[in-house]
């Protein structure tokens, strides 16, 4: 089974479309969607309505949530799947990519990371300020944590991995960069990167703020002291053609 963990905060306008697209992308796959919701609006009600149509949908509503990273971690704890994925609810991570991530996992990967920065990828859904901010965060992370240096897009929030990767990991996430935590503390030997095109947000509002940047720097400082220095891994980069091989 594949468990898709999705943290939500006031994303009511995107939920129905998101679930419908995931269902199409994962046709033929045994999957579940685990929403971990910190919303102040009617997002929980929308999720429960959608769950009547899609029984694969589950939700954990947190009245006193402590941010995206802890929401995802709670979702991992609830997940039943052999494979676990994380993605945003705002549709900037196109759900169809889940199909190709799953394909990479079935090929023998321990970790699959869609990248905006390899041939076939695109970060066009970011405005110029977000591109600078994202690039700076990526470079700082790679300087502070050697374990991130082989990964082209290590600060993304879109990824999939085998459950065993985090079974013995001491995850203490803060802020938003949950994949950085998993890469630094997990155990894995093969990473597959696949290209994807980051989309523009069409509904709802971005949740980024200056607080997110400060939390990220605090997270890096903490991880630098305790990341899994013994982990060794190889990275395999798939072209668009290889990724889509087998599509009808």
Language-model segments: what does each one mean?
Residues 60-78, 83, 95-176, 201-211:
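Acceptor/aglycone-binding surface of glycosyltransferases and processive sugar-polymer synthases
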Residues 1-3, 32:
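Cell-envelope/extracellular polymer assembly enzymes that use nucleotide-activated donors
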Residues 1, 144-149, 171-248:
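Hydrophobic helical membrane-anchoring modules
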Residues 11-14, 39, 94:
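Donor nucleotide-sugar binding loop of glycosyltransferases
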């Amino acid at each position: 089974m594949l468990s898709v963990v999705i943290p939500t905060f006031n994303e009511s306008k995107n939920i129905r479309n998101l679930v419908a697209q995931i269902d199409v992308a994962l046709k033929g796959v045994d999957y579940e969607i685990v929403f971990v919701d910190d919303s102040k609006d009617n997002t929980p009600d929308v999720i429960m309505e959608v769950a009547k149509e899609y029984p694969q949908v589950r939700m954990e509503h947190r009245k006193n949530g402590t941010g995206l990273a802890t929401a995802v971690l709670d979702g991992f704890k609830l997940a039943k799947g052999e494979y676990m994925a994380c993605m945003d609810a705002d549709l900037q991570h196109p759900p169809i990519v889940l199909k190709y991530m799953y394909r990479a996992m079935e090929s023998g990967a321990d970790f699959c990371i869609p990248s905006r920065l390899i041939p076939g990828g695109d970060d066009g859904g970011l405005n110029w300020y977000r591109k600078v901010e994202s690039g700076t965060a990526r470079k700082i992370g790679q300087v502070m944590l050697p374990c991130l240096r082989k990964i082209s897009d290590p600060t993304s929030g879109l990824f999939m991995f085998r459950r065993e990767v985090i079974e013995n990991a001491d995850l203490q996430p803060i802020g938003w960069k949950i994949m950085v935590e998993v890469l630094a503390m997990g155990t894995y030997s093969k990473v597959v990167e696949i290209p994807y095109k980051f989309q523009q947000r069409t509904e709802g509002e971005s949740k980024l703020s200056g607080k997110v940047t400060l939390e990220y720097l605090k997270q890096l400082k903490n991880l630098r002291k305790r990341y899994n220095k013994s982990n060794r891994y190889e990275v395999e980069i798939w072209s668009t053609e290889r990724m889509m091989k087998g599509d009808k």
